[in-house]
Amino acid sequence: MVPELIAETAVTHFSDVYRPVQVVHKMIDKLKRKRDHSVKDVPQLQMANLSDNPTAQIIRAPKRTKLDAMLEGIMRVGDDMYDHAQPDNFSPLALIPVVNEKGHSPLSLIDLHAANEASNGLITGSGYAHTPYQADLADAHIIKIQQGTAYYEIDSQLMAQEFGDKSFGAFADEAYASERGYAIRTNPHTGNKEMFVAGTRNGWDWASNALEVTGASHILNNPVHSGVRAGEVGYMYATGNPVPPEYLGLAEKVADTIETPNGRIATPWRAKAQEFYSQVVVDEEVDVVYGHSRGGAIVADMQLPAAVTKIGLDSAMILADNKGMINFYQGGRGFDPGHPIAWFKSQVDMALGSTGENNIHLEVEGMHTHELWNHDSEDYMLEP
């Protein structure tokens, strides 16, 4: 699929379908602040004020490029969630895994140094400690997070090694290739039993994403098939191929016939997935569950034993009801003329994860979105 055609189509369909959930109104401001090392080639944009005129069209400036259209399509995704996602005042609540019943942290990446935790109420029954922070893991080797007499340390180098290890990439690939969309392994570094839940894998998943986000108010005023169209566009830019007819036909049929009271017409399928994966966790005695992209939204809402740690990787938190799961995200990849689709994906990932309350931005040199833990990593994988 030609990137320019995808961008042009995405501007229309994504802006129409995702407007009700409006994600990141000033994403371009963050890109501009990173211009020195990531977006030197991104042109200036002229934008319509959607908050004043929801039906406004993109202003078409002279000599606009297809990249302009792609960026503007992303920008039109959001207004309503601006207060949650504005980069200038974004200060999430960190959800940090602490020592579990086996005596070590889930990833062996976080050292816990605390005094009087019980009296201060920092350690909750679910096995997590809550503390506010504002930090970018790219800025330092050790990140210290402190509240009262307790502080926590995150070793960004160890974290990069864990997620950048080839064994983790193989783990993710196995999940995406499996019939039921998950894989289980024993972590070679920690000894923990881990499960990886894959995200969007086909046209039906893309249609489900669009239909879930659309919501009842949009369904009442617009053809629900626009959600299917957005899913089709998403599948094409993710794979470069047309949606298989069987998936598209199924999505169209569901769009014609099914709507739940809350309007998120794909939710019943995600609920079934949550129930299935939750039972697998119990049966297999899993210690840590990773969820990527749509899989992260599934994992976030899974009801699991308190000892099990849930970790999101570029999770689509916009789909999840539970916004509190820890979510490592790498959105905001710098524009690379050689890989425009990978760059576009990174912007979408950041937008779809923006509603998470416990996002941790992991941006370490050599690590980029969709290169380490995504199923299409072979297209963009860096050499070790």
UniProtKB/Swiss-Prot annotation:
This protein's source sits in the domain of life called Viruses
What is the protein named?
Answer: Viral protein 1
Annotated organism of origin: Chaetoceros diatodnavirus 1 (Chaetoceros setoense DNA virus)
Give the organism's phylogenetic lineage: Viruses, Monodnaviria, Shotokuvirae, Cressdnaviricota, Arfiviricetes
